[in-house]
Amino acid sequence: MKEKHKILYTINKYLLGGFFLAYYRPKFENKHLVPKDGPIILCGNHVHLFDQFLPILSTKRMLHYMAKKEYFDSPFAFFFKASGCIPVDRSIHDDNAKSSALEVLNEGYALGIYPEGTRNSLACKKDKLKEMYEFVNEEIPFKKFKKIMKKDMVKVSQTDLLLKLLAENKIIKDNIKNNIYRINEYLLELESANVITSNEYYDSLLLPLKYGAVSMAQKTGAIVVPYAITGKYRFSKNNLKVTFLKPFTVSSTDDLTEKNNELAKEIKDELLKYSK
């Protein structure tokens, strides 16, 4: 299979990528860990819409990202097709998307996957955003609240932990209300006070990983390359960074749960360095 849209992909990469680099001034660490040839699966955390730019700009290879089908039904459909993305219908078990991804790997190309299966962003989860807004709805308009949650890149995995603690009567509503704009810091305080364990805080850094990445690696012999994105998407903030982590393979005899846990651990270990 010949890689489609490679010329357009390259043009988009250098035009949009140049603007991205100038605007956000990101850092790239351990780019040498990304293999220059052969089938690979790049896997990382996903909070911001622009997350795929960082891995794409880290390698000369064309990176085929799996993206939700809705993007291909939008006015920007051509861009996603030209970027080599594979549409995924998340409302069903999408065998067509899986077959396309396996074909990419069997041809020796590079695939990008967000193993959490969705963006770990409160701002883009309508129902969960409204649930958290209930704690401050008398103080701030909904649109402004959403804007703050988006700017601060608040994670669903961390707000879910707070709601769990509330349900278990370990905290009260006022605790959430008073700390809703500093959720990560508040969770660290709860860890220090032994209200939550270190493992509970650690697990709040990511949503539970799906098995797609390690499963496809096992079927194709592809190398899994984990990465972690840290920092904020702010103009010239210069703390946005992608760090590539130790690659690994998944043999036919490996346990997928163990390998999926290995993938999650690599990413969370790196995120933990920047969360405290």
Task: Set out the residue ranges of the language-model regions.
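A transmembrane-helix-recognition feature enriched in membrane-embedded lipid enzymes
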Residues: M1-N30, L54, R61, S74-S83
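Short, basic, glycine/proline-bearing loop/turn elements
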Residues: L15-L16, A82-D89, V195-Y201
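Structured helix-beta-strand junction loops
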Residues: A22, D37, A82-S83, E107-G108, ...
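Short amphipathic alpha-helical segments and helix-helix/interface helices
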Residues: L16, P55, A77, A101, ...
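Glycine-rich helix-loop-beta junction characteristic of Rossmann-like nucleotide cofactor-binding loops
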Residues: K31-P35
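Catalytic core of membrane glycerolipid acyltransferases/transacylases, capturing the structured
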Residues: K36-H93, S100, K128-V156, D160, ...
